[in-house]
Amino acid sequence: MSQQLQQIIDNAWENRAELSPKAAPAEVREAVAHAIEQLDKGALRVAEKIDGNWTVHQWLKKAVLLSFRLEDNAPMPAGGYSQFYDKVPSKFANYTAEDFAAGGFRVVPPAIARRGSFIAKNVVLMPSYTNIGAYVDEGTMVDTWATVGSCAQIGKNVHLSGGVGIGGVLEPLQANPVIIEDNCFIGARSEVVEGVIVEENSVISMGVYLGQSTKIYDRETGEISYGRIPAGSVVVAGNLPSKDGSHSLYCAVIVKKVDAKTRAKVGLNELLRGD
């Protein structure tokens, strides 16, 4: 079924300029709607780990983008305190008490998740925003004013602290989603964007900014890398001097690496304060 869906959506993408809410084949509408439904249920996801490597399913990103071409903006009631005007309804717009109980997660007002995002059991959504295509796995806390961008992949038992920004990547289409693996802690007001991968059991301190052009300096080895935080890293904000010493520029510094056992036993503050 997925291969057939993919073919229909790939073909529709090539002819997307001809599509509109009033002009789209029924086959395309049904395929896109089904893909969004499967993303919403977590049956499909934009990226998944296969044999130890992350694989991105670009056709599902195409399905999300096509859904914007196929839908008109429409008023959306917001419980009497406001109205919204958009193409994508709330994930929880038609939820009953039974639906919430079956989902097994908490949604604290006024948290918003768009339809097409997946929220797993034991997730807590504080007043936050989760965009279409995102996948938030079991036991994760999305704290107040945190944002989970389109198609971002958040692992199990992750803590996204207050005001954290996880970037979305619907465009450019070739871009990979941000991935936060299992058991990571992302400190308050930090930003992870542009397809950066934070591997499992890592701790990102408050106010760390990670994009593809951010230098990641490992102080134990002196190595500089980009785009990936290795498993078990403890990362703080820092600076590196220019070659001529006239100025310094922002970087992220890996101050130490810890295994999962140490990560579980040692408090976060102790990890971040250690020399």
Curated annotation (Swiss-Prot):
Q: Which PROSITE patterns match?
A: HEXAPEP_TRANSFERASES
Transferase listed as a keyword: yes
* Places the protein is found: Cytoplasm
Which pathway features in its UniProt record? Amino-acid biosynthesis; L-lysine biosynthesis via DAP pathway; LL-2,6-diaminopimelate from (S)-tetrahydrodipicolinate (succinylase route): step 1/3
- Please provide, alphabetically and separated by semicolons, the GO molecular function terms listed in this UniProt record: 2,3,4,5-tetrahydropyridine-2,6-dicarboxylate N-succinyltransferase activity; nucleotidyltransferase activity
- E.C. number: 2.3.1.117
List the Pfam families: Hexapep_2, THDPS_N_2
Q: What is its main location?
A: cytoplasm
Q: Which residues are the signal sequence here?
A: none
A single GO cellular-component term from the record reads: cytoplasm
Q: Which InterPro entries match?
A: DapD_Trfase_Hexpep_rpt_fam (IPR005664), Hexapep (IPR001451), Hexapep_transf_CS (IPR018357), THP_succinylTrfase_dom1 (IPR023180), THP_succinylTrfase_N_sf (IPR037133), Trimer_LpxA-like_sf (IPR011004)
Keyword Oxidoreductase found: no
Stated name of the protein: 2,3,4,5-tetrahydropyridine-2,6-dicarboxylate N-succinyltransferase
Gene name of the record: dapD
